Amino acid sequence: MMKKPVVIGLAVVVLAAVVAGGYWWYQSRQDNGLTLYGNVDIRTVNLSFRVGGRVESLAVDEGDAIKAGQVLGELDHKPYEIALMQAKAGVSVAQAQYDLMLAGYRDEEIAQAAAAVKQAQAAYDYAQNFYNRQQGLWKSRTISANDLENARSSRDQAQATLKSAQDKLRQYRSGNREQDIAQAKASLEQAQAQLAQAELNLQDSTLIAPSDGTLLTRAVEPGTVLNEGGTVFTVSLTRPVWVRAYVDERNLDQAQPGRKVLLYTDGRPDKPYHGQIGFVSPTAEFTPKTVETPDLRTDLVYRLRIVVTDADDALRQGMPVTVQFGNEAGHE
């Protein structure tokens, strides 16, 4: 009977030991934190003019710091200014034609067309009567067959002129056809699109910095004739500053987006930077050879992007960084 309390006591002791051990493991995991190794991400961009032309001027040189919106260089604007003037003239012509189509014909134009019909009708009547007389003369052998044919030809020509005048008067009275108006509108829209393209081309003959950065290389000099898209500068982007690191699957649960971390560099080991995980790769990959821990290079890991929230100029691209997880880093 004494064995039962002993067994229960031992079970309680074992359970307490398991709970205490688990709590100690959890605390040690939280207190000691996870340490990863990475590098400040290298981000560069090749800058180029979207249009081609002769380089007129370049405002920066290698090593210069640039700001977003800063003018970096310009092409010769003259060809694009001329093209813009031509496009504006094209819009004016197309607009005038479209307005005429919408307005239709004036009363004066209709009256002139009606007068032309009367004149053509009189000419036709005369030609028809003359032809009739010539037929009688030909039957009596007074004129030749050639004279009769000339009279017929004059009659037919007068008839065609009359029909053309009648068609024109009919068109003037009924106004322009919907198809003609639609065609004039399409021509106007095409001219407006060409104008917009000309304005964009002139704008793109000036090279503007897309973001803050440092100029790494200058590939051309003033006077160079470039094709569209030809590289002019290579720029290292300085903001925002990202750290690239890798975590294995066993510790993936600690590296969640929004998690805050501390970032240490060799130059300031006692004054860490602060960062926040912004991205965790959804797919595993083999650790790159650049990782400082050789024993992890053959493991499958997940790439992290850590945004440095208090970066300064001392944090250079490619610099090795130690990433420290822990309670002092905190959570979002």
UniProtKB/Swiss-Prot annotation:
Pfam families assigned to the protein according to its UniProt record, in alphabetical order: HlyD_D23
Originating organism: Escherichia coli (strain 55989 / EAEC)
Gene3D superfamilies per UniProt: 2.40.30.170, 2.40.50.100, Helix hairpin bin
Compartmental location: Periplasm
UniProt keyword terms in alphabetical order: Coiled coil, Periplasm, Signal
HAMAP family in UniProt: UPF0194
Domain of life of the native organism: Bacteria
Residues in the signal sequence: 1-16
InterPro entries: CusB_D23, UPF0194_membrane_YbhG, UPF0194_transport
Protein name according to UniProt: UPF0194 membrane protein YbhG
Name of the encoding gene: ybhG
Coiled-coil residue spans: 108-209
GO cellular component: periplasmic space
Membership in a protein family: Belongs to the UPF0194 family.
Main location: periplasm
